UniProtKB/Swiss-Prot annotation:
It comes from the Eukaryota. This is Alpha-conotoxin BnIA. It comes from Conus bandanus. The modification Cysteine amide is found at residue 64. Alpha-conotoxins act on postsynaptic membranes, they bind to the nicotinic acetylcholine receptors (nAChR) and thus inhibit them. This toxin inhibits acetylcholine-evoked currents reversibly in oocytes expressing the human alpha-7/CHRNA7 nAChR, and blocks nerve-evoked skeletal muscle contractions in isolated mouse neuromuscular preparations, but with a very low affinity. Expressed by the venom duct. Its main location: secreted. It is found in: Secreted. Disulfide bonds join 50-56, 51-64. Residues 22-48 form a propeptide. One of its GO terms (molecular function) is ion channel regulator activity. GO terms for cellular component: extracellular region; host cell postsynaptic membrane. The cysteine framework is I (CC-C-C). Alpha4/7 pattern. Keywords: Acetylcholine receptor inhibiting toxin, Amidation, Disulfide bond, Ion channel impairing toxin, Neurotoxin, Postsynaptic neurotoxin, Secreted, Signal, Toxin.
Length: 65
């Protein structure tokens, strides 16, 4: 294999790695956003549950208002 062919193969590998890495990063951004939404929903439900119980709402006036 000549030097030009080896250099071309190297560039193809670098390009393929970059494309796969970029696509993987974008996909994980979506999963991270979904996990964050799910966590905030869980926190909201927990706060709502606490605020509906008198003892919990008295102990946490900053959360329950």
């Amino acid at each position: 294999m000549g030097m030009r062919m080896m250099f071309t193969m190297f560039l193809l590998v670098v390009l393929a790695t970059t494309v796969v890495s970029f696509a993987s990063d974008r996909a994980s951004d979506g999963r991270n956003a979904a996990a964050k939404d799910k966590a905030s929903d869980l926190v909201a439900l927990t706060v709502k549950g606490c605020c509906s119980h008198p003892a919990c709402s008295v102990n946490n006036p900053d959360i329950c208002g």
